[in-house]
Amino acid sequence: KPKKGEESVVVCSFGDASITEGEVAEAFQMASLKKLPILYIVQDNEWDISAHASEMRAVDATHYAKGFGLKTYTIDGTDFINSYKTINKALKEIRNKRSPILIHAKVPLLNHHTSGVRMEWYRDDLEEANNRDPFPKLKNILLQNKFTKEEIINIEESARQTVYSDYERAIKAEDPTPEDLFTHDFAPTKILKEEGERSPKDKEPTVMVDSALFAIKELMSEHPECLLYGQDVGKRLGGVFREAATLADTFGDNRVFNTPIQEAFIIGSTVGMSAVGLKPIVEVQFADYIWPGLNQLFTEVSRSNYLSNGKWPVSCIIRVPIGAYGSGGPYHSSSVESVLSQINGIKIAYPSTGADLKGLIKSAYYDPNPVVILEHKGLYWSKIKGTSKAKTIEPSKDYIIPFGKGRVVLENKNTDDTMCIITYGMGVYWALNAANNHKEKIEIIDIRTIFPLDEKLVFDTVNKHGKCLVLTEEPYNNSFAQALSARIQKHCFENLDAPVFGMGSENMPAIPLNSTLEHTMLPNAEKVSDMIKEILAY
């Protein structure tokens, strides 16, 4: 534990133009709400690139931050002594009161934005900016404080030598090889094989949502660094699907807590949590709500390990209830796996049973990389007809499933006039129910994880039967499923007896609220059965 007055403080420095980003508002909101020890330093030169602050900002950084309850100091950032004193004062206050402070430092812009965007093209304040240059002002302060001109020259020369030495060192550093491009996309994981007991004896099947709940409860009991947060997961409700029920009561509000409707914060905060040794499990309440968080997922979470040469993997789990269920309508029914599959640097699971969900949550926890787990709402309670097999015996505490390992749901050793269905999530149950109409003709593979994908199982199964249907809940055009179909077509071409078929929802912008239209849009067992007939007859 640090000594009094030496507690850690986070320093966040950014420009005045970036303060208008919506994610800054989310950060200020949570910093103020949770009394986080953060010092925000805004360097305000009044310019974006060519747009001036008077055109772009309704209020300056000071007034904006006060709206979130942050204490602020406004300073002349070219005044070294006042800046130094104010920053020290702010740090002491943050440590004593444990609350965020923003310092609004007004500074000149002394150079071009880039070599291709020249300041003389659009600015009429260049003389004024040069008159505010902090460097000559600092030299005058040093002279007033008994430094000699020779001492100041020596300080300047020492700084030049340091910069030049660092530059020379960088120039002499070995260039990367082409092979270096392919390192550090993921941190290595130790979870390489399935372990533990999947179906212990003398137990009754449990619903899928409880399998996840039990997995997280076991993890939080064993690991004090494990946190769970998101919208409505706290004590009052325990999740809108009861997926976090009792966890806040058991582990306290400091480890299980609600967040505002701030998906960018929910996802982006995992970077910092992971960096200080915590393991965040966060929830985006519906897949439809993940869009505001994609910037953080794409630009920060997925790339951290790669851009830091393996030093800063973001170890987190992002739970996302997904899929159409019970006329949820256009804002509660979407599928998002195709977009997520285009984000390199994250792992994606989409289990179809409680046992798989528990095993994959455990695997994700011990994986040092960011993992998104897509959990179909219609399978949580097995209330949809034909999904009872989503209920499973709860696996043992040590049960774990490696990513990139699919499951044979329905095996078929017969290869005479047969076919296979490659699917995941709700598609597993459409396929199973359709297969009842085609006895001994169908083999079903549940890929379980979208990335990494069990290509060997998929390709071996397609090669075995020669005919294949890739089944998804998403609209099929331009989807992950369609891309998978192309991979199968390429790798299994010589053994195919028919083109690789694909089926998904109708290619419409959204899933309607009306139940008749929802039913019309989605695949179902009857539609799958009809396509099976077509493929077998090909």
Q: Where on the chain are the PLM-derived regions?
A:
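Hydrophobic/aromatic ligand-binding patch that stacks against planar heteroaromatic rings
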Residues: 30-32, 64, 93, 272-273, ...
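Thiamine diphosphate
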Residues: 1-11, 22, 26, 41-172, 242, 246, 312-314, ...
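A short alpha/beta connector and helix-capping loop motif
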Residues: 21-42, 302, 306, 455-460, ...
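Active-site glycine- and acidic-residue-rich loops that bind
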Residues: 17-22, 78-87, 351-358, 365, ...
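Glycine-rich, charged/polar anion/phosphate-binding loops
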Residues: 24-27, 85-92, 303, 355-361, ...
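DG-centered beta-turn motif at the end of beta-strands
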Residues: 8-19, 35
